[in-house]
Amino acid sequence: MIRNIKVEHLHETPIEKQETELVERKGVGHPDSISDGLAEAVSRALCKEYIDKCGAILHHNTDETQIVAGRSRPEFGGGEVLKPIYTLLVGRATMEFDGMEIPAETVALQAAREYVRNTIPAMDLERDMIIDCKLGTGSSDLRDVFTRDHVPMANDTSFGVGHAPFSELEQVVYNTERQLLTDLKKKKIPGIGEDIKVMGLRENNDISLTICCGMVGRHIDDMDHYINAKEEMTEYVLDLATKYTDRTVSARINAADKVDGGCDCVFLTVTGTSAEMGDDGSVGRGNRSNGLITPSRPMSMEATSGKNPINHIGKIYNLLSTQMARDVVSAVDEVSDVHIKLLSQIGMPIDQPLVASAQVIPEDGANFAHIQSEAVVVIDDWLENITKITDMVVKGELDTF
């Protein structure tokens, strides 16, 4: 099959040589990320339910989850949620197939509660959060689109974008949030909340990190304990950064804190997320499908979480383009940066995009003809096996935010 694959030489300064770079990550406890996580958890649970009962994934989209912030009174040693967070699971799902009813809303609620329990352990689901579900009915007439007997047809004319490799700053920002939660919180500072936002700025060879972290009051005894925890976190972040860069790195945690003159104004929470006290959340307002917000790179603004993994281009092409970019960098020598853009055409097979564009910034002196031919092979192979993305999503092997 001949596909429209374009590999072009991009005459642009590689990201590592640009003077200024910005990168952001909203952690898993940020209200927008909670919305993303819930939407994807529900979609994944529905996929498994459909496969178990119907033998195939049926039509659904759960990418409209909304979080309405609650109200809380955090304090050292405890605190309480005064008004619970309200979460609404919204979308479409197939609830009947060949005369069999499918408990889609029950599955969605169970998946959402399990996700919150596993992601924000300080959240008391009996008191701190209300989870509601309003799924509309998807059409079972779409089942022909959702079979494994042929390549699905694109549900829309849309595009996906990915890039590789991660720059040093992108690695620092991504892993700062991940390691604070998966390592430092578990081993030493349980007071670290899941609502962590990391903003990274690189100016030439100087990197500055601004980190906001909602600390969990029940694990923080007093102001001295809070300040000491921040100091330990700062040291940890600076040490972690040396694994990814030799550049000079500085870090500030909870820069808005005011502790002088008797003003104890700090980022303290009851549950570990600012959703408890004023911050709402929506799907698609946070990280892109690679886990970052990268204004120095090409990006798609479309949400990935919660969309069906069969034929929804907003999900498949964003995830696929990132995998393609990473494999091009891994398999092809002398590539500094690569940007992948995939454009679908509604009603056409998803393995035949209107264009698969790879813009490559080669290393100095590279043989671009060789890069071009090798990149085409990588891209074409992924398109030939595009349904692998669906399998990876259902198995939980790909993150969407």
UniProtKB/Swiss-Prot annotation:
Disulfide bonds: none annotated. It comes from the Archaea. One of its GO terms (molecular function) is magnesium ion binding. Pathway: Amino-acid biosynthesis; S-adenosyl-L-methionine biosynthesis; S-adenosyl-L-methionine from L-methionine: step 1/1. GO terms for biological process: one-carbon metabolic process; S-adenosylmethionine biosynthetic process. It is an enzyme of class 2 (transferase). Its cofactor is Mg(2+). Residues 278-305 are annotated as: Disordered. Its EC number is 2.5.1.6. ATP binds at G136, T137, G138, S139, S140, D141. It catalyses: L-methionine + ATP + H2O = S-adenosyl-L-methionine + phosphate + diphosphate. Keywords: ATP-binding, Magnesium, Nucleotide-binding, One-carbon metabolism, Transferase. The keyword Zinc does not apply. Belongs to the AdoMet synthase 2 family. NCBIfam families: PRK04439.1-3, PRK04439.1-5. Catalyzes the formation of S-adenosylmethionine from methionine and ATP. This is S-adenosylmethionine synthase. It comes from Methanococcoides burtonii (strain DSM 6242 / NBRC 107633 / OCM 468 / ACE-M). The gene is mat.
